[in-house]
Amino acid sequence: MSIKTSNTEFKTRIRQQIEDPIMRKAVANAQQRIGANRQKMVDELGHWEEWRDRASQIRDHVLSNLDAYLYQLSEKVTQNGGHVYFAKTKEDATRYILQVAQSKNARKVVKSKSMVTEEIGVNHVLQDAGIQVIETDLGEYILQLDQDPPSHVVVPAIHKDRHQIRRVLHERLGYDGPETPEAMTLFIRQKIREDFLSAEIGITGCNFAVAETGSVCLVTNEGNARMCTTLPKTHIAVMGMERIAPTFAEVDVLITMLARSAVGARLTGYNTWLTGPREAGHVDGPEEFHLVIVDNGRSDVLASEFRDVLRCIRCGACMNTCPAYRHIGGHGYGSIYPGPIGAVISPLLGGYKDFKDLPYACSLCTACDSVCPVRIPLSKLILRHRRVMAEKGVTTKAEQRAIKMFAYANSHPGLWKVGMMAGAHAASWFINGGKTPIRIGAIGDWMEARDLPEADGESFRSWFKKHQAQEKKNG
């Protein structure tokens, strides 16, 4: 299992998504609603740019001292009675998790929403071993029933409306209740509660780990992560190795930014802090705690010119403002990481072979840059991907030939002049009344909505010479 969610060719995926009116309406409504709520919370907090500066500084500091903080975190978790496993690859991570599950003779695992567990494909590994995995986040639960991948890092089922959700519940679970969010949520809640009470293991992600205390922070709106960590006897937390904060003081800043940027709230409904397994005399918490720290290519990213992307706190704000995401949704990207952040991180974790198109699924409007709470220069990193791909020859043969032809013409002035004159004459033949009969792919659609300037068959160079001579003549 990789971060790739579709084997369909990129252009075909895009066409399918654009032609899906339900998805486009659902995503547009969500973007508008979350964006408006976010702006209210930003205005209420005040000094937002200073908050962004501070959050960015915290993340940069952690990345610059990551080895030290990882060591400190590991020591503290161990002192607290937990187990720590450093996984170099996704295979290492899933192998360890499976070993823990098998050592407990686990038949059922409950799981809260986690992008890193999606990234390493833990569900598939456990299911292949005969262990039932139940997603307990409301959106993820619906997607699991429908065998549909998530399309947003915070709101995984953003692409579905309530009619589709009711259909899924009816077909998979026999739901015959009303088509209201409240009724469907209550139905799912009753189903999941049975799983919470019977699962041997709970698996969660980790929004932030606190190096100073060895604590794990879980941020949710439904409280399901808290159930995953208190009812099962064993809790396994999985984190990307960069998701560390030095102390609770830094976490305070990051959570402030996360809640406002992700869903437009002061705080999410539940902020859970876990520091090791259940202590003697306590009634809540797991008997055993495991922290799996995943590299899976992050060390290479940290050492590269793309290291700024590791600041990401998975808030999804870039998706909530991106015009490309609005039209093609998360599934158009073919990765568990969609949107602008996905256009940067997917090629880094999954390679250019599968994700070479994503850096071009961007208009470079820089809207994502302006909302990122940790100031990741996403548009610059997307451009950087394009440069790297050109240097490595990853681009299409047609593009490579076009660039070579342009470079050759541009380095031969005589040929360039002839080409400009020929182009000027050709433009006058093919443009009439602002329109042209030429229709080539997306250019045809672009020209349908725009009028081209009229061409008189004269190149700028000849026009300039003529006017320069006229000015000299007039003295």
Where are the predicted features?
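The feature marks the mature, well-folded catalytic cores of soluble enzymes
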Residues: 1-306
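Intrinsic disorder at enzyme termini
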Residues: 6-34, 44, 407-475
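Generic, well-ordered alpha-helical scaffold segments in large soluble proteins
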Residues: 72, 76, 80, 96-100, ...
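Short coil/turn segments at secondary-structure boundaries
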Residues: 139, 182, 267-270, 397-401, ...
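Short capping/connector residues at structural and topological boundaries
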Residues: 215, 249, 275-279, 338, ...
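Ferredoxin-type iron-sulfur electron-transfer modules in oxidoreductases and energy-metabolism complexes
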Residues: 281-309, 320, 324-433, 437-439
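Phosphate-binding glycine-rich loops and their immediate beta-loop-alpha structural context
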Residues: 312
